[in-house]
């Protein structure tokens, strides 16, 4: 039985590259994102190279969509919490609160919603590995980035706490901070 990897935000950038790489390494890929056409292109690329890929179109900002899409899954060996957003980078006194909500809902709450559904499956299976894509901005803040940097600092803290929570269940938690 092939190992299964779930990648959020797999429609571009790090998520897409990770899906392609893990498929080459023999993982069955479950690629998620908001843009169905990009997921279809990724699925085509993986399957054309001999891999296996399932796509799920949903927005990690919606707990209901996350649960509906992910609860039916039986086993996940590797989770890559990659979905992320940097929007409306402005000085704090000029920021648009809608952009702030979008970043926090995607970068923090989305990661939590996905992990809340997948972690119990890993616990039941006796192990797994969760990769959270943070950012160096989480520990090295910059001008115009207060909310984005704060959201990635949250990913850093969540990753450390998740590691402590899940270690005894045989689940590794790794934060990657590009």
Locations of regions flagged by a protein language model:
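The beta1-alpha1 cofactor-binding region of Rossmann-like NAD(H)/NADP(H)-dependent oxidoreductases
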Residues: 57-68, 97
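Substrate-binding pocket helix/loop in short-chain dehydrogenase/reductase
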Residues: 90-92, 96-101
């Amino acid at each position: 039985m092939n190992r299964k990897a779930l990648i959020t935000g797999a429609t571009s950038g790090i998520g897409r590259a990770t899906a392609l790489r893990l498929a080459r390494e023999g993982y069955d890929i479950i690629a998620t994102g908001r843009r169905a056409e990009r997921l279809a292109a990724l699925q085509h690329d993986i399957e054309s190279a001999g891999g296996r890929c399932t796509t799920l179109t949903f927005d990690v900002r919606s707990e209901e969509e996350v649960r509906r899409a992910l609860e039916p899954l039986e086993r996940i060996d590797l989770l890559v919490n990659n979905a992320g957003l940097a929007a409306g980078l402005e000085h704090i006194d000029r920021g648009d609160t809608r952009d702030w909500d979008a970043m926090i809902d995607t970068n923090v709450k989305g990661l939590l919603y996905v992990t809340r559904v997948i972690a119990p499956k890993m616990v039941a299976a006796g192990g797994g590995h969760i990769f959270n894509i943070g950012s160096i901005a989480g520990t090295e803040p910059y001008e115009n980035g207060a909310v984005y940097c704060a959201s990635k600092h949250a990913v850093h803290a969540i990753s450390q706490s998740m590691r402590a929570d899940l270690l005894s269940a045989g689940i590794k938690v790794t934060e990657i901070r590009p």
